[in-house]
Amino acid sequence: MGVDIEKGVAWMQARKGRVSYSMDFRDGPDSYDCSSSMYYALRSAGASSAGWAVNTEYMHAWLIENGYELISENAPWDAKRGDIFIWGRKGASAGAGGHTGMFIDSDNIIHCNYAYDGISVNDHDERWYYAGQPYYYVYRLTNANAQPAEKKLGWQKDATGFWYARANGTYPKDEFEYIEENKSWFYFDDQGYMLAEKWLKHTDGNWYWFDRDGYMATSWKRIGESWYYFNRDGSMVTGWIKYYDNWYYCDATNGDMKSNAFIRYNDGWYLLLPDGRLADKPQFTVEPDGLITAKV
């Protein structure tokens, strides 16, 4: 089954002035954004399923899978009905950073956009100038009978980093994800890339650490020259911690474990041993020069 451009145009025309624009509720039937409207229009025209309504970042590869060819990259071209434009450089076009739509003739485009709160027909160059003349790509259908290659699932890697493709073709983005094959939680940033060897302060107010392989830290973890303790859900612990039969103290601000030192907590002083354990009934001696020594 190939892509029929006229069916795609008809899908958009049928919804012109009848749907609203929304990046939060982009899967219809009452609202779409620029990329989801293009996705569903081309799906109605015979394009293959990606498992989700691809955004402008992932639309490039999806178009090529469905028989489109990149015919212009930020260079003049003679537009034809059915050409699809994508504004915004790859890697920086997701969300409000990009835009896409379809040409219905050499000058005009049909697109779902914020300015008209829905699907409208406009002069391409006017809208492009109004948007600040963004970097652009143009794709044209050259093989209407293209059969998309088998989708790659699981862990994927490119020059930027790792991401994870789910069985339904979607990918985690700006969220935690439990990967069964790794038996661990991971976190993926707003571009879908795995965090590695990084701290994350989440919107829940907690701090999390992900090691060089992206695994979320739990229990004790040495990071740099300090030790930290993380709950089973990965959140960093501060204050007193009872671990088996011993007590430890992690800084209330930074979370690093204190050791070989006195700490003041509430109205008392506590002695922590070199390995961080709270000393059990230490004996103190005040030397003639005022130095306090401890016997543990």
Curated annotation (Swiss-Prot):
E.C. number: 3.5.1.28
Segments annotated as Cell wall-binding repeats: 152-171, 173-194, 196-216, 217-236, 237-256, 259-278
Location relative to the cell: Host cell wall
Catalytic activity: Hydrolyzes the link between N-acetylmuramoyl residues and L-amino acid residues in certain cell-wall glycopeptides
Molecular function as annotated in GO: cysteine-type peptidase activity; N-acetylmuramoyl-L-alanine amidase activity
Annotated Pfam families: Amidase_5, Choline_bind_1, Choline_bind_3
Disulfide bonds listed in the record: none
Keyword Repeat tagged: yes
GO biological process, one term: viral release from host cell by cytolysis
Catalytic machinery residues: 34 (nucleophile), 99 (proton acceptor), 111
Family annotation (PROSITE patterns): CW, NLPC_P60
Primary residence: host cell
Entry keywords, A to Z: Antimicrobial, Bacteriolytic enzyme, Cell wall biogenesis/degradation, Hydrolase, Pharmaceutical, Protease, Repeat, Thiol protease
Residue ranges of every copy of the NlpC/P60 domain listed in the record: 1-142
One annotated Gene Ontology cellular component of this protein: host cell wall
Function: Lysis of bacterial host cell wall.
Family label: Belongs to the peptidase C40 family.
UniProt protein name: Lysin
Source organism: Pneumococcus phage Dp-1 (Bacteriophage Dp-1)
Gene (UniProt): PAL
